[in-house]
């Protein structure tokens, strides 16, 4: 899963994702404005995307 953030915010957001300790997430790699989220199983991708969408709702 790839997530785009505001410039210079990817590392902070990746740290927050890592701290959630979701079993489906193996880990994250963050650049300046992009995060790669490694998901354990292909079948878990839709669940993870759904969780991120819920977190981003206003």
Regions found by a protein language model. Name each.
Residues 51-57:
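C-terminal output/interaction extensions
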Residues 1-49:
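Non-DNA-binding regulatory cores of transcription-related proteins
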């Amino acid at each position: 899963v790839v997530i785009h953030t505001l410039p210079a915010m990817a590392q902070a957001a990746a740290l927050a994702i890592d701290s959630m300790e979701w079993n489906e997430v193996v880990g994250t790699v963050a650049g300046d404005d992009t995060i790669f989220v490694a998901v354990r199983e292909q079948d878990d991708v839709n669940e993870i995307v759904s969780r991120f969408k819920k977190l981003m709702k206003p």
